[in-house]
Regions:
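Substrate-gating cap/lid alpha-helix
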Residues: 156, 173-214, 240
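Short, well-ordered beta-to-alpha junction loops that form the rim of enzyme active sites
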Residues: 62, 100, 170-173, 215-216
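Generic structural signal for well-ordered alpha-helices
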Residues: 81, 150-154, 197
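Viral virion structural and adsorption modules
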Residues: 3, 84-86, 198, 206, ...
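Short hydrophobic segments within beta-strands
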Residues: 8-9, 169
Length: 315
């Protein structure tokens, strides 16, 4: 496995003092105590790099960022692609990309701009209405825009790092700490969660990049509000990422390389060491709660006045 790693991500992958100057960071100040992630060694990316015996070159993660957007701080922007390189312009041996949950939560770059998202590119904010608008459904064609942006992001990285091993990690559902049942909203704005992961896989396969299909593990990770991992959730993510990177071929053999929707591997394929991060792995298997309507229309939405919160209050 690679010696030097760079990370491209959103808030889940930030940590105070470890991201480029001026980048928004989630894991800082009082949030460190709230999540229990008080030391950088507890982050998923530090744990993953340690697992492979590597070192961090650059953590190019910006809190709140989407893939789509075309301008900084979107993942699909020249500035983010430039930030993946070392201070001397050197390319890493491997890039691990874990980004896209904000695209799912907002329903796209335009909705992020209209909702006055904190990480919206200035070029898009300038076109947004003065008053905040929180639309319930993603605009038609959202998954195609996401896949196009994801492929463009990959092309920007490849142009700067032609010899680098690039890993695309699929999105993983979270669960609030202490909750005994699945809570994740699998159809938040009318575009199913599975379609985002299928788009990630397709874009990666078409570009010849690796896919770490962490979703295929079939597990929820622990988070303070369902999105941002606790210290335990960080260990769970790191374990799922490492296992899916090491077993890419076996996952493809079990599930195929086409659209997987919500397919996961049998829990018997997962090693005991990985499952030990859940006190009862059977209870932490992820599953959709219902298929009645998009979650943003539902009376059980946990934060209807929030821009987004991907949890169901009826679970």
């Amino acid at each position: 496995m690679a010696k030097t790693f760079s990370i491209l991500g959103d808030s889940i992958s930030t940590f105070d003092g470890w991201n480029p100057p001026g980048f928004d960071v989630f894991y800082s100040d009082e949030r460190l105590e709230k999540t229990g992630v008080t030391h950088v060694e507890q982050t998923w990316w530090h744990l993953l790099i340690d697992h492979f015996g590597g070192t961090l070159l650059k953590n190019d993660s910006f809190s709140g960022s989407l893939v789509e957007g075309g301008f900084f701080p979107a993942g699909d922007s020249d500035a983010r692609a430039d930030a993946i390189l070392g201070n001397e312009g050197e390319a890493p041996d491997a890039i691990v990309c874990f980004i896209g949950i904000n695209d799912y939560g907002w329903g796209g770059a335009k909705m992020n701009a209209d909702g006055h998202g904190s990480a919206c590119p200035a070029e898009l904010s300038a076109q947004a209405p003065v008053e905040k608008v929180l639309a319930e459904l993603a605009a038609p064609g959202q998954i195609e825009r996401f896949k196009t942006a994801y492929a463009s992001m990959l092309a920007r990285l490849r142009a700067r790092c032609p010899e680098t091993e690039i890993w695309r990690v699929t999105l993983v559902p979270g669960r609030i700490a202490g909750h005994a049942k699945p809570q994740f909203a699998y159809d938040f704005r009318g575009v199913p969660f599975a379609e985002y992961n299928d788009a990630i896989r397709a874009a990666a396969h078409e570009a010849g990049a690796h896919v770490a299909d962490a979703f295929a593990c079939g597990m929820d990770y622990e988070a303070i509000e369902g999105t941002h991992p606790t210290a335990r959730g960080m260990r769970q993510l790191a374990g799922m990422f490492a296992w899916s990177m090491e077993h890419e071929t076996e996952i493809d053999a079990a599930l195929g390389r086409g659209a997987r929707e919500l397919a996961t591997v049998p829990q018997s394929m997962l090693p005991a060491e990985l499952l030990s991060e859940w006190e009862d792995a059977t209870l932490w298997r992820s599953a959709p709660l219902c298929a009645d309507k998009p979650c943003s229309f539902c009376e059980h939405a946990m934060a209807p006045n929030n821009a987004w919160l991907l949890m169901c209050g009826n679970a």
